Amino acid sequence: MGPAEQRHAMDTLMIGALSLETSRLALQRSRRPLVRQFAEFEAEESTTVAQVIAEMTGMAPPPLRPVERRLVERLARANGPAFDREYLVGQITAHRQILDVQERYLSAGRNMHHRHLAMLARGRIREHLRELDLLQRSRV
């Protein structure tokens, strides 16, 4: 595995770990059914992507860095609509970052398996960004 593949895997795992942690929190704390549904799907997908990367590379998600841990702690202190707002904003930020990771790899990476993962992930991430935009606008 070359440097581009290592970076692709690690960046995907790192962002996915934060998304998973905040989505688990949203499953417990959100009062909005559609936000909880999104969080459930996101948690399942983040877990699956981490499993795929582990099988491809032997790499596991890293522990959250201090800055990410502080984001989770801040989210955990929020309640009600403020919680949902913070969660959705965080998910949009994370999805934009992970989309950039996939596009960066697709522009230069050559490993077929990583390219396939990046192609599949890119489509789902774009869908998630549209869903997150709708969730931000709705009150359900």
Question: Language-model features: where?
Answer:
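His/Met- and acidic-residue-enriched segments that coordinate or traffic transition-metal cofactors
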Residues: 1-140
